[in-house]
Amino acid sequence: MRLLLASASETRLALLRAAGLELDALPARIDEEGVRAALEAEGASPLDVADTLAEMKAQKLAERHREALVLGCDQVLAFRREVWGKAPSPEALRAQLLRLRGETHKLISALVLYEEGRPVWRHAGEVRLTMRECSDGWIDGYIARNWETVRHSVGGYHLEGEGVRLFSAVEGDYFTVLGLPLLPLLNYLGQRGFIPT
C-alpha cells in the first residue's frame, strides 16, 4: 500500500526515509491557525489540538487518495495554559523565547493514520523542555542567524541545530521533539505488515 505523508515538513520526510520507508509527501492545506483558535476557545487541551490538526490533515489527503495509507502529523507547544504554533515573524519569535527562558514547556506531537478513508491509528508523544536563562542579546543573535531555518518550527528552534543551546534539559523522546514519534509509528506499521519486521 502506498504511504503518503500529509505534510510539507522536510524533517519528517527525511526521518521516515532514513528509517527505510518509501513514501511521498503532499501538504494538506488546512487553516491551522483558525482551527487552533477555535479549539482553544472551546477549552481543548494541547493534546486535543495537536490530534485534531493531525487528523484533519490526514483526512483531507485521504479523501483524494483512498488507495493510500495517509499519515497526518501536527505539533504544538504548550506553555502554562496556552497552545502555541509557529511564530509568524522574528519579532513574535523573540517574544516567545523571552517568555520561555528559564521555564519549562511541552512539545506535543500527534500522528493519525488513515486507511481507505478512515482513521485506523493515532498516537501522541509529549516532551518536556527546560530553557536556560539566555541573555536578550544571545536570543537576538540566535534569531538573526536562524530565522530562515526555524521559521516553520513550533517553538522556533531545531534541537538538531544551534537551537539545542537554548536548553538546559530535555525529558522525552528525541523523535517527538522533531515532530514525529517515530518508534510507535514503525511498531504499528510492522504489526500491520506494511513494513517487514
UniProtKB/Swiss-Prot annotation:
GO molecular function: nucleoside triphosphate diphosphatase activity
GO annotation (BP), single: nucleotide metabolic process
Keywords, in A-Z order: Cytoplasm, Hydrolase, Nucleotide metabolism
Keyword Transport: no
Reactions mediated catalytically: a ribonucleoside 5'-triphosphate + H2O = a ribonucleoside 5'-phosphate + diphosphate + H(+); a 2'-deoxyribonucleoside 5'-triphosphate + H2O = a 2'-deoxyribonucleoside 5'-phosphate + diphosphate + H(+)
EC number in record: 3.6.1.9
EC category name: hydrolase
Location of this chain's protein in the cell: Cytoplasm
Cofactor(s) needed: a divalent metal cation
Transmembrane portions of the chain: none
Alphabetized CDD domains for the sequence: Maf
Pfam families, A to Z: Maf (PF02545)
Keyword Hydrolase set for record: yes
Active-site residues annotated for this sequence: 74 (proton acceptor)
CC per GO annotation: cytoplasm
Function statement: Nucleoside triphosphate pyrophosphatase. May have a dual role in cell division arrest and in preventing the incorporation of modified nucleotides into cellular nucleic acids.
Family under the similarity heading: Belongs to the Maf family.
Protein name per its UniProtKB record: Nucleoside triphosphate pyrophosphatase
Organism: Cereibacter sphaeroides (strain ATCC 17023 / DSM 158 / JCM 6121 / CCUG 31486 / LMG 2827 / NBRC 12203 / NCIMB 8253 / ATH 2.4.1.)
